[in-house]
Amino acid sequence: MERQTIVILDLGGPNNQIIARRVRECNVYCELLPFDADIQTIKNFDPAGIIIAGSVNDRQITLDKSIFELQVPVLGIGQGQLLIVRTLGGKASVQDSKYQKAQITVDSTHSLFEGASINFEGWVNQSAKVDTLPLDFCSLASIKQNKNAAIANDKLKVYGVLFHPEYNNTQDSIKILKNFLFNICKVSPNWTMSFYARNYIKSLREKIGDKKVLCALSGGVDSSVCAVLVQKAIGDNLVCIFVDHGLLRKNEADEVEKYFKDQQGINFLRVNAQDRFLNRLKGIRDPEKKRKIIGEEFIRVFEEQAQKIGEIDYLAQGTIYPDVLESANVKSHHNVGGLPKNIKFKGIIEPLRSLFKDEVRQLGLTLGMPERLVFRQPFPGPGLAVRIIGEVTKQKLDILREADAIFREEISLVGLDKNINQYFAVLTDMRSVGVRDEERTYENILALRAVTTTDFMSAKWAKIPHSVLERVSSRIVNEIKAINRVVYDITDKPPATIEWE
């Protein structure tokens, strides 16, 4: 069988997952490993090629030379090229991180740049410089006075580019990445969600047999896709527990039950624990305490219900690839509150463990799930409890649910729901003076939050048209008597976070 996996050695940096996502977008499977992964770990993936990328400037970083003895193509990007040069006997330097767009001139006759423009713009660290090339390397591109902006040793199949094709996402930059994958590494573009679903369903059937699987279903994208995929494999042997803690958005709990129980035919157990959660949250104002109480209470409810069901062999959870990259251990901060401590399972099933968020959404569509579930807005595990500043009460939840529903409805009506990555309402703990029916009022202030982002590590506040904001505000203050003022949050992340609590 032909090698099909690309190993990416990560040098660190805030955007370390971008190159992996670009490779996956080319329908090629890749694994992200730390730059100092031992050679046997790399060999275990039987890679068709290796990419070295990252943006952390550290002159102390070194590479294991045996990487270049694996007889597979290697591509260094940005700092990755500098590291290749230093490791193989050349000289390279970098002063700081000053990334700017620059005009790049390339040798379009080389297979790495085949089909790309001779001149194009790319992001590059202006202070990065290759002073002396290693033996038998040649230059393929130049940037201003830097003649070694891309290098190659075709005999070793080792290449480097100082610029970052993963940032541009233009026709030229993607062409360069595809040339490395398809012309040099000779992989095939066979990594699709249809391919993944077929293979995973087959392997899970063989692994599980007639044993039972329990899934904690929150209704979020990850747990929902996880449940549907597992059900496709084992049918009625899957049991999903949905804990309705009363902190969801308007009609959300009913929609989750309708789809999974009525339409999908999954063994679905909805547990009404609204009063239980509200009682635990009574008098609590600190956001961290709210989060811990909700997480702990979820676990208690989950444990109680799981023990009523009887013997369960496996637990399924919606861990996704970014979770795995953040920690070498099983994630304990799953969107349903964490793994139960004292329920024994033979194993954990994580069907989405190798997928990025966009791949999870694509898998959901491939499995026939409706867009409204697949493209559901990101929603914090503690739900509306952390979108109510201060103590959580049923009255406040009802107010926020209605206001949030109006905001989401108006955003959807004007077609902005696919352009804005996250948008929601926050019920503040402030009141203001207002006028209604010629009488003085003293009611709640509601804040609206909307952001655009690619990775949720940073975000820009969304420039929603004033006419839309005006309509949202007018509807909220007219339809919800408990609110008499609406404000819009225009703060980026950083310095703010996306959520208020």
Each model region followed by its residue ranges:
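RNA-binding accessory domains that recognize and position tRNA/RNA substrates
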Residues: M1-I52, V56-R59, L63, F68-L70, ...
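Short beta-strand-loop/turn "lid" adjacent to the catalytic site in phosphate-handling enzymes
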Residues: I320-N329
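Short, well-ordered beta-to-alpha junction loops that form the rim of enzyme active sites
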Residues: F163, Q317-Y321
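A generic "binding-loop/recognition-motif" signal
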Residues: G12, G80, I320-Y321
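Gly/Ala-rich beta-loop-alpha elbow adjacent to hydrolase catalytic centers
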Residues: G76, G80, V85
